[in-house]
Curated annotation (Swiss-Prot):
PROSITE patterns: PROKAR_LIPOPROTEIN. It is found in: Fimbrium. GO terms for cellular component: pilus. The gene is yraK. This is Uncharacterized fimbrial-like protein YraK.
Length: 363
């Protein structure tokens, strides 16, 4: 029996693992970041918008151009990856909103194509590596699109994220002026990778900080006595009974009058309202509204005093005199007024008249 020769062979294939390297990217420098800010200066919020549940969009972000400065070595071909994270930490009334202050929540919306690789609008929420924004474009100095430190043929300048919008949501109506200090709302972070993998969360570096600042004003329309002038008539006074200094005429009955106001429904507004009364014809010793001046020397000789019957205050000053406003925004203040002799002795005959203004102020 003839045996066939056996030939054996072995193919050895060596294997090695290739790992993608990655790192952070800054704006203009590897540690740099730029700021885009929405400035809402001197914006008036009318009454129809100043209600819980109303939304409005803030001003367009101001932006500057910059260039990528990634930590990769010069000449390296890399891809760019982005991650956008909220800076505010207190969640708002629903997902995607964060608490800006006691009256406003804010939502950040990235616009499609405003960041390379972002194909649809995206609301900024808590991000993980699974929500990274990836772009398949390869950047390198060889193609005049270098992004690594030391690259001379660079990509850009750019202003990614400049079309981001902020939506403000009224959680609690407010009155008067609201100052929003410069507040970072979200941050666009960047990283590079030279393979198919994903950068780790620690690789990402701040590129763009998105912030808001400014002033909002919410005026409140108040009607006092339906807009009519409040007139208090003291009638005819016997001059012989009007001689005691800083006193009303003997036997005089003070005149009661009402100040009726309607500021709409303020029950859900965190601010408080007050009415302030100020004399416009002059004031003596803060409590006496000048109603007449003596013809011989222009010295005030007749004054008017008032008190709040419901507040237990005997005299209301005519300089920053404060009257209460009910939290509901409407009501009536019961007042009393009387004339006083400011100089003592018998006064000249004739008319007297004093005027004051009432202003509703916000606290």
């Amino acid at each position: 029996m003839k045996r066939a020769p056996l030939i054996t062979g072995l193919l050895l294939i060596s294997t090695s693992c290739a790992y993608a390297s990655s790192g952070g990217c800054g704006a203009d420098s590897t540690s740099g970041a730029t700021n885009y800010s929405s400035v809402v200066d001197d914006v008036t919020v009318n009454q129809t918008d100043n209600v819980t549940g109303r939304e409005f969009t803030s001003a367009t972000l101001s932006s500057t151009n910059w260039q990528y400065a990634c930590s990769c070595s010069a000449g390296k071909a890399v891809k760019l990856v982005y991650m956008v994270s909220p800076v505010l930490t207190t969640t708002g009334h629903q997902t995607g909103y964060y608490k800006l202050n006691d009256s406003l929540d804010i939502k950040t919306t990235l616009q499609a194509n405003d960041i390379p690789g972002l194909t649809t609008d995206q609301v900024v929420s808590v991000n993980t590596r699974f929500t990274q924004i990836k772009n398949n474009t390869v950047y390198s100095a060889a193609t005049q699109t270098g992004v690594c430190q030391g690259d001379t043929s660079r990509y850009g300048p750019v202003n990614i994220g400049a079309n981001t919008t902020f939506t403000l949501y009224v959680t609690k109506p407010f009155l008067g002026s609201m100052t929003i200090p410069k507040t970072d709302i979200a941050v666009i972070k960047g990283a590079w990778v030279d393979g198919m993998g994903s950068p780790s969360t620690g690789d990402f570096h701040d590129l763009v900080k998105l912030s808001i600042q400014g002033n909002l004003t919410a005026p409140q329309s108040c009607k006092i006595n339906q807009g009519d002038v409040i007139k208090v008539n003291f009638g005819f006074i016997n001059g012989q009974k009007f001689t005691t200094r800083n006193a009303m005429p003997d036997g005089f009955t003070p005149v009661d009058f009402d100040i009726t106001y309607d500021c709409g429904d303020t029950s859900k507004i965190k601010n408080s309202l007050q009415m302030r009364i100020d004399g416009t014809t002059g004031v003596v010793d803060q409590y006496n509204l000048v109603a007449r001046r003596r013809s011989s020397d222009n010295v005030p000789d007749v004054g008017i005093r008032i008190e709040n019957l419901g507040g237990g205050v005997a005299n209301i000053p005519f300089q920053n005199g404060i009257l209460p406003v009910d939290p509901s925004g409407h009501g009536t203040v019961n007042m009393r007024a009387w004339p006083v002799n400011l100089v003592g002795g018998e006064l000249e005959t004739g008319k007297f008249q004093g005027t004051a203004t009432i202003t509703v102020i916000v606290r």
